[in-house]
């Protein structure tokens, strides 16, 4: 355990608590079996938020142990992709962030089953921390709107949850302004407007960590850095835009 955590640059402040809980698990055949089963469940992408699973009490880092064997695999995969070492270290620090989140919520460091479930995106190599943000790798995500751009650079959003009509001459629908669907209907002539984003486009979903600067320069630098990393390291993962539904 110590060798893996050191090599992956994770959870250094919590080492003693982790080793203490590991000793407890080793003493219990039932807990050892549970950790093995959870590791296999995580590897196949199983849902750990299922209400039929009741986590054992009294072992704060139990749900970290199924993830530890996957950590070197994650680092090796990112290096194979030529992801910058600074991004790899920052990405692996999501384990520390998960413990810190529970520390703020409960008053003690721990790694709960919900955090293991969340980190499946990292375990399955679909997650990066770049600059200020966490980024899921490209996928199709529900937008709720379709995005249109005019020949003058103007952007318009039409709500996708109500009918959008497309004729030979125009796109017709209800505009979405500041997140609110308007009652009026607008017409966007095709001579000047084209659809820029729709339900079949691949997007990069963004998550906003609680700590860190949030000024415009920091945000734009993070987007630019993310574009560079995706272009250089994930040329087989094209995307059309960034999308954020984070808290």
Predicted regions and their residues:
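Glycine-rich acyl-CoA binding loop
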Residues: 215-226
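A generic secondary-structure signal
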Residues: 225-233
């Amino acid at each position: 355990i110590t060798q893996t955590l050191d090599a992956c640059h994770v959870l250094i402040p919590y080492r003693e608590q982790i080793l203490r809980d590991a000793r407890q698990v080793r003493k219990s055949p039932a807990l050892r079996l549970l950790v093995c089963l959870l590791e296999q469940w995580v590897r196949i992408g199983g849902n750990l938020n299922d209400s039929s699973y009741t986590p054992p009490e009294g072992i704060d880092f139990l749900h970290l142990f199924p993830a530890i064997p996957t950590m070197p695999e994650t680092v090796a995969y990112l290096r194979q992709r030529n992801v910058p070492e600074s991004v790899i270290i920052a990405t692996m620090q999501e384990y520390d962030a998960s413990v810190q989140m529970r520390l703020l919520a409960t008053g003690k460091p721990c790694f709960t089953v919900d955090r293991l479930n969340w980190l499946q995106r990292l375990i399955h190599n679909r997650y990066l921390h770049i600059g200020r943000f966490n980024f899921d790798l490209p996928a199709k995500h529900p937008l709720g709107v379709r995005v249109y751009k005019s020949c003058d650079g103007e952007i318009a959003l039409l709500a996708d949850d109500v009918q959008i009509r497309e004729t030979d001459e125009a796109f017709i629908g209800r505009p979405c302004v500041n997140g609110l669907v308007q009652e009026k209907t607008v017409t966007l002539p095709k001579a000047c407007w084209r659809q820029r984003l729709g339900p079949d486009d691949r997007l990069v979903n963004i998550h906003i960590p609680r700590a860190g600067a949030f000024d415009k320069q920091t945000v734009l630098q993070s987007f630019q850095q993310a574009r560079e990393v995706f272009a250089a390291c994930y040329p087989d993962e094209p995307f059309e835009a960034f999308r954020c539904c984070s808290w």
